Regions:
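Transmembrane beta-strands of outer-membrane beta-barrel pores
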Residues: 4-10, 22, 33-37, 59, ...
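Transmembrane beta-barrel wall of Gram-negative outer-membrane proteins
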Residues: 6-35, 40-78, 101-122, 170, ...
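Membrane-embedded beta-barrel scaffold of Gram-negative outer-membrane proteins
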Residues: 15, 20, 113, 122-140, ...
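C-terminal beta-barrel architecture of Gram-negative outer-membrane proteins
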Residues: 32, 37, 302, 389-391, ...
Length: 515
């Protein structure tokens, strides 16, 4: 196939993809070239090249594939801007403070997968190696720290990840009941070189820190599904994860080694179906990992003040109860309520562009998802969710989690198999969010409406028009609240909402031919 797209704001896209028989198997290939400026005063000039090449051979009973993927891009970044500068007319919504922000990225990967299945067993092995290299330039506080050169900083990162996954599943019986058991192992090794540099117009001024990091993780798991009765089954699992961190920093005090391990049990109880309806209860434990550098840190590399270390792995516990039903013809619905606790919440720092380990947190929520296909040519997806997110400890600053979305909803309709016509329309809503812990500053809600309509000119040729932000909403994609300083302000700057707008209304045209 060949696909060519053009649109407003410098949008250009070309895609070539296909597959053919080769050496007893199948060779798949694809190449994408992409450019977009966006609606910003200084265009993003986002250039991207994507390529994939995959050779596969075998059947469902056994086979393998080898895949190579390459991705490279470069862009200008219009980062979040202070609301006060838009309110007083200094900037428009699509302006920037530091026009030299941006970055370059590349990602190359090579992977292989093998599987072998019999009537009662299934074995899978896959491995991959990925090299990521990026260099990002950002300036979120403008002139707060350095009134002469500005606060731009660079985050160079070069990492190679190597991973091996293997699993074996078999059917059998447990206490005379039909049962399936899976055992598996996952091994990952990351070699990372990164840093934090002070820059001006992408030129290095000084070095805050440089680090060489080696992170090794091993996870082993066992999962069993047993059908105890016609309408009752369980899924029981246990996983053990071990992480080893080694950091060699340009600041000797921040070098070191540490390790951590956690066991994560999980249990699911599934009842039914009755009248095409199932009920389920899930409970379990998991974790998130922290930045390896934080596990051995001793001093703040920027201020020189003593710094607290963070645990390598942070415990998470959760439970969920739900119902899945198809009792209404052509409608699949799921309703669930859940609770999720973290021993330490990962908080994104809008003024630094980094995450930090925060206070213990809890989320309690409800989700309702629906997939409805009233006719062969119309599909409707409707989802709504609400979550109450709070810190669990007591602190005078407040209990709200900055940036935690409280309510989200989406409604989408797609049309196909309606003669030569096809299309889709999607509405999405993200509710207001607290921006600081005491909830005194909140973002507004974000609403988008996107759509597309197409016509099949012939059996192998189609044309499609896409529209983005059809209501031309002035919503924000992100909002943060922190201190920054503009050139005409005092040394302490001001606390303010900083936002990045969603893109303005735009249209694109795509022509696709299949051979």
């Amino acid at each position: 196939m060949v696909s060519l797209g053009v649109g407003e704001n410098g949008y250009r896209r070309g895609l070539v993809a296909g597959s053919s028989a080769a050496v007893g198997g199948n060779l798949l290939y694809a190449l994408e070239i992409f450019h977009n400026d966006g609606p910003f005063s200084k265009g993003d000039n986002y250039r991207k090249i994507n390529g994939v090449l995959r050779y596969s051979r075998g059947t469902e009973a056994g086979g393998f594939n080898i895949t190579a993927i390459a991705y490279t891009s470069a862009y200008n970044a219009t980062d979040q801007i202070p609301k006060r500068a838009v309110d007083d007319g200094t900037l428009n919504r699509f302006s920037s403070i530091d026009s030299t922000d941006g970055g370059k990225v590349h990602r190359y990967s090579l992977s292989a997968a093998w599987h072998q299945n019999t009537e009662n067993t299934a074995t899978k092995v896959n491995a991959y190696i990925i090299n990521n290299r990026l260099r990002i330039y950002s300036n979120f506080t403008y002139f707060l720290d350095d009134p002469v050169n500005g606060d731009q900083f660079a985050q160079p990162d070069n990492r190679t990840d190597m991973t091996l996954n293997a699993s074996h599943a078999w059917k059998g019986s447990l206490f005379g009941r039909l049962s399936e058991t899976t055992v598996g192992i996952q091994i990952q090794r990351d070699a990372i070189r990164n840093g934090l540099l002070s820059t001006k117009a992408r030129q290095e001024l000084s070095e805050t820190r440089r680090d060489r990091i080696k992170e090794t993780s091993v996870g082993a798991y066992l999962e069993n599904t047993t059908h105890w009765a016609e309408k009752f089954r369980t899924v029981v699992g246990i996983r053990e994860d071990y992480y080893k961190f080694a950091v060699h920093s340009s600041l000797d005090a921040n070098s070191g080694r540490t390790h951590a391990s956690l066991a994560s049990p999980k249990l699911s109880l599934i009842f039914g179906p009755w009248a095409k309806t199932e009920f389920y209860l899930n409970a379990g434990a998991g974790f998130h990992s922290n930045d390896a550098r934080g596990t051995v840190i001793a001093i703040d590399p920027k201020s020189g003040d003593p710094a607290d270390r963070v645990p390598g792995l942070v415990r998470a516990k959760g439970a969920e109860a739900g119902i899945r039903t198809e009792i209404i013809p052509r409608l699949q619905s799921t309703l669930s309520v859940y609770g999720l606790d973290f021993a330490s919440e990962l908080i994104f720092q809008g003024d630094a562009g980094t995450t930090s380990a925060g206070r213990p947190s809890r989320r309690v929520g409800i989700e309702f998802s629906n997939y409805y296909k009233p006719t062969d040519w119309l599909t409707i997806d409707a989802d709504i969710a609400y979550a109450k997110a709070r810190f669990r400890d007591v602190d005078p600053v407040g209990r709200r989690i900055p940036g935690a979305v409280e309510g989200v909803a989406s409604l989408a309709a797609s049309v196909d198999n309606l003669g030569p016509y096809f299309g889709a329309l999607q509405f999405r809503y993200f509710g207001p969010r607290p921006l600081i812990e005491d909830n005194s500053v909140r973002s507004k809600s974000t609403t988008t409406l996107n759509g597309r309509a197409g016509y099949k000119v012939g059996p192998n040729v189609s044309v499609e028009v896409e529209g983005f932000n059809l209501l031309n909403s002035k919503s924000s994609a992100i909002d943060y609240y922190y201190q920054s300083r503009l050139p005409n302000e005092g040394p302490n700057g001001e606390n303010d909402i900083h936002f990045h707008p969603i893109e303005s209304r735009s249209a694109r045209l795509t022509l696709t031919a299949r051979f």
